[in-house]
A protein has these predicted regions:
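Small-residue-rich hydrophobic segments that form or flank transmembrane alpha-helices
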Residues: 32-110, 171-180, 184-245
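Selective transmembrane alpha-helices of multi-pass membrane proteins
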Residues: 116, 120-128, 136-156, 235-249, ...
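Membrane-interface helix-boundary motifs at transmembrane edges
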Residues: 107, 157-163, 196-200, 252-260
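N-terminal amphipathic/basic-hydrophobic helices that include classical n-h-c signal peptides
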Residues: 1-21
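Cytoplasmic-side transmembrane-helix entry/capping segments in multi-pass membrane proteins
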Residues: 109-117, 164-172, 203-207, 260-266
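Alpha-helical multi-pass membrane helix bundles of inner-membrane/thylakoid proteins
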Residues: 143-145, 152-175
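Short, strongly hydrophobic alpha-helical membrane anchors
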Residues: 16-31, 284-286
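Interfacial loop-to-helix junctions that mark the boundaries of transmembrane helices
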Residues: 24-29, 70-71, 133-140, 229-233, ...
Length: 286
């Protein structure tokens, strides 16, 4: 169990304001830094390999290292912006260089994307307000409970499926709110989008959606005076970049097969991490 480096009681109030210090990473123990570096490699891998999961499959591990969500959410948000843009732009750039065709021809379903945004934008904003205003331990426990539910569904191969317009609406509203609080609403949103989009269009349309929603979240963080940890990107963006390249290779493989065993393994890991995180926060509170 990784011992949580809790902030002193008087400094755990929200939001985390900008200071003249570089960031909390200044006095981070070396082995914590190594763990965070490896977790961000994993984050980049699952984001580009699966089209989602950069947050839901990495944030629980990060919170075991340090249980302050507002330390890591800005980092994960910026990585989502950078690598979702790269993933969408890469085919355009490759086609332009190899064939001289620079048309903005993407696999994004813009019409459906506008429909999804119209539904998710309000709960997204409510979730962002919640993560800024609520105490850290409340958000941390909320994240671990949601991750536990996801882990059980993956382990049992019972992923969220929507087969009715009313259920579509419920999943999108919940997914928008959870995304606003913790960036882990992807499985609920994907349950809806996967039913309406071709598989070739799903990943890029998801990335476009994440880009817009995360931009809103980062703008809210900046407006609230939360430290966006810009200096930490100097060493964590390369980590996510390594994972991103590996994930692109995995994505090409996953289009040909159904990686059920992989997702079941992920589910078991998420259950373990979520239970460990809930136990850790309960011990810290007692």
């Amino acid at each position: 169990m990784i011992e949580s480096r809790l902030l002193p009681k008087e400094t755990t109030r929200r939001p985390l304001k900008k200071t003249n210090r570089m960031s909390f990473f200044d006095d981070l123990p070396f082995w914590h830094a190594v763990l965070i570096f490896l977790i961000f490699i994993w984050s980049g891998f699952v984001r580009s390999g699966l089209g989602f999961g950069g947050a839901v499959l990495s944030l629980p591990f990060l919170l075991l290292v340090h249980d302050q969500p507002l330390i890591f959410l800005p980092l994960v948000s910026v990585h989502l912006l950078v690598f979702s843009s790269l993933t969408i732009a890469q085919p355009i750039v490759v086609a332009g260089i190899e064939a001289g065709d620079w048309r903005l021809d993407t696999n994004i379903d813009w019409l459906y994307l506008r429909k999804i945004l119209a539904i998710t934008i309000v709960p997204k904003l409510l979730g962002v307000f919640g993560v800024i205003s609520l105490p850290s331990h409340v958000i941390t426990n909320f994240i671990f409970v949601i991750v536990l539910i996801y882990g059980i569904s993956y382990l049992l191969n019972r992923q969220f499926v929507s087969n009715h317009p009313t259920l579509d609406l419920i999943f999108l509203l919940l997914g928008g709110y959870i995304s606003g609080t913790s960036l882990i609403g992807a499985p609920l949103i994907i349950a809806v989008m996967a039913r309406h989009l071709l598989r070739e269009k799903l990943r890029d349309t998801l990335f476009a959606l994440w880009f817009i929603l995360v931009s809103i979240k980062l703008a809210a963080f900046a407006a609230a005076g939360i430290d966006l940890q810009w200096w930490a990107h100097l060493w964590l963006l390369p980590a996510a970049g390594i994972g991103h390249i590996l994930g692109l290779k995995f994505h090409r493989y996953s289009l040909q097969v159904e990686p059920k065993r992989f997702m079941q393994f992920i589910g078991a890991a998420l259950i373990f991490v979520a239970l460990a995180g809930l136990w850790q926060t309960s011990v810290a509170a007692s």
